[in-house]
Amino acid sequence: QFGWIRFMTNRQAAERILSLIDLTNLNDVCTDEDIVELCTRAHGEFGTTAAVCVWPRFVDLSASHLKHTSIKVATVVNFPHGGTDVAAVVDSTLAALDVGADEIDVVLPYQSMIKGDEASVVSMLQAVREIVHAPDHLKVILETGELSDQGIIRRASELAIKAGADFIKTSTGKTKVSATPEAVTTMLQVIRDSE
């Protein structure tokens, strides 16, 4: 799948890879100055990142700073604990979109997934999908380190894709175990099988 990289110079490969990733600051003590620096860093020597990902309280500042660029503003909802309050997640999503978010990264209610409560998972993901319309993107964070079992990771990936996720992601980076090669392999297999 990544054979294209063999035909590129190092600079071309760096530019291509950079254009596919988010530059993120979800530090708990993040400041306005940190966000301005993040937005500035998103324009690098080798091009620009796809997006910056920030706390909801910084969406407006980021959107303002990146207004005349192709860089998208992503934010997180239901983050980092993956709760089950659909109404709160919908409200957070609407508020973020209203102030300029282009991408919503929602944490899947992973405790529900662990308990086998797929209906709660689907309900939340569908509710968010209903309000995140193209060209905006919906990304679903599975929190694979908490799911741990590859069968559950597979099923969570399937549910997210079926609910209309544009992207699936491994983790929040806020748990003891984040991305693992096994989880990534499982997720990639589900993506492949869904095409």
Regions found by a protein language model. Name each.
Residues 51-54:
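Short, hydrophobic beta-strand segments that form beta-sheet elements in well-ordered domains
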Residues 1-8:
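Short, Lys/Arg-enriched N-terminal segments with co-localized hydrophobic residues
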Residues 10-47, 57-195:
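Alpha/beta enzyme core
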